[in-house]
């Protein structure tokens, strides 16, 4: 029996003039523009399909916590009984506000008192692609995660954050006891060739990286509180950054912690796909086949014709979800 599961979705209206003006006031020359470029705040205008997908494919969800600076989509019905509007100021300590960092917004989610112990964190570009069961996310009230060790090979500036995670994880879990004591959670048919990563990891000490699934992430509220208790100084420093920084950590740290404390159940590799917006043909194929539970459509530097690509994807979603959800006016 799975306890109540809440969804949490974060959203920013990058076109809001009030938000943009406040952002400008706090912008500083940090020399790392790729971490805070405009594509991070560009609106694909697909968010209504996120709600349509939830209503159709996950009607069992307890509540949806909509995290916002203060703005709301014009079409959103804020009076829906399952929808909880939460402003940053409602749960993030005032010394961290205003914030323009998704890491700060996510690292403090455990402070939302009404949020259930089991919750699933979405960004607004991660869509439920087919029918979703509670057991796809939690089993025995534990989050289902990919327990695959994969070497971190830095290729972009954002990878500093993953390196920061490994510094913490190796400080606490250098011996990988969970791997040695619960091998059945690290070796299974569903991992295919990725089992080799875990096999090789037996022969060396320390953790050199994890294989990440860019999908909606199941979390335990208590894990956030535990890490804040153990690494409060570090997290406080991260949360004082107004913008994302190479010295940050993010909510993936909580997932890794759950793996190393054996507070998880294995997830399948086919749980989701991460596809750049520019690869619209692949997006169409994944939506049509419905083999993956989640689809992350990422607007990144590969998107050359933003308007055309978004319009193409919107037509696909409109065909799949033609009816308004009850979350829409």
Curated annotation (Swiss-Prot):
Out of the domains of life, which is the source?
Bacteria
Name the enzyme group at the top EC level: transferase
| InterPro entries in alphabetical order | Stealth, Stealth_CR1, Stealth_CR2, Stealth_CR3
A Pfam family cross-referenced in the UniProt record is: Stealth_CR3
Alphabetically list the UniProt keywords.
Answer: Exopolysaccharide synthesis, Transferase
Note the SS bond partners. none
UniProt GO BP: polysaccharide biosynthetic process
The keyword Plastid is annotated on this UniProt entry: no
Q: Which GO terms describe its molecular function?
A: transferase activity, transferring phosphorus-containing groups
Q: What is its EC number?
A: 2.7.-.-
For this chain, the family text in UniProt reads: Belongs to the stealth family.
What further fact does the record state?
Answer: Stealth proteins are part of a protein family that is conserved from bacteria to higher eukaryotes. Family members were first identified in microbes as proteins that help pathogens to elude the host innate immune system. Microbial stealth proteins are involved in the biosynthesis of exopolysaccharides. Stealth proteins are predicted to function as hexose-1-phosphoryltransferases.
What's the protein called, per UniProt? Capsular polysaccharide phosphotransferase WcwK
- Which organism's genome codes for this protein? Streptococcus pneumoniae
Q: Recall the taxonomic lineage recorded for the source organism.
A: Bacteria, Bacillati, Bacillota, Bacilli, Lactobacillales
Primary gene name: wcwK
């Amino acid at each position: 029996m799975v306890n109540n599961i809440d969804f949490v979705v974060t959203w920013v209206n990058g076109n809001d003039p009030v938000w943009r003006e406040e952002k400008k006031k706090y912008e500083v020359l940090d020399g790392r523009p790729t971490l805070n470029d405009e594509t991070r705040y560009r609106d694909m205008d697909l968010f209504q399909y996120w709600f349509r997908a939830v209503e159709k494919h996950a009607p069992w969800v307890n509540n949806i916590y909509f995290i916002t600076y203060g703005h709301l989509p014009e079409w959103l019905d804020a009076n829906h009984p399952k929808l909880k509007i939460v402003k940053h100021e409602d749960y993030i300590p005032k010394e961290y506000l205003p914030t323009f960092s998704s890491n700060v917004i996510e690292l403090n989610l455990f402070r939302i008192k009404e949020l259930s112990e089991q919750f699933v964190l979405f960004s607004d570009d991660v869509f439920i692609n087919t029918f979703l069961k509670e057991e796809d996310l939690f089993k025995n009230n534990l989050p289902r995660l990919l327990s695959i060790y994969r070497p971190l090979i830095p290729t972009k500036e954002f990878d500093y954050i993953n390196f920061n995670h490994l510094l913490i994880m190796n400080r606490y879990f250098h011996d990988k006891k969970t791997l040695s004591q619960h091998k059945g959670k690290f070796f299974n048919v569903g991992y295919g060739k990725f089992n080799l990563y875990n096999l090789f990891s037996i022969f060396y000490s320390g953790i050199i990286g994890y294989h990440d699934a860019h999908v909606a992430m199941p979390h335990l509220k208590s894990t956030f509180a535990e890490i804040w208790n153990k690494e409060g100084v570090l997290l406080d420093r991260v949360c004082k950054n107004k913008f994302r920084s190479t010295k940050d950590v993010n909510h993936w740290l909580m997932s890794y912690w759950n793996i190393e404390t054996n507070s998880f159940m294995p997830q399948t590799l086919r749980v989701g796909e991460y596809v750049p917006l520019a690869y619209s043909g692949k997006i169409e194929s994944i939506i049509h086949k419905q083999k993956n539970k989640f689809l992350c459509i990422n607007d990144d530097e590969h998107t050359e014709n933003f308007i055309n690509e978004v319009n193409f994807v919107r037509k696909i979603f409109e065909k799949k979800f033609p009816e308004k959800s009850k979350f829409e006016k």
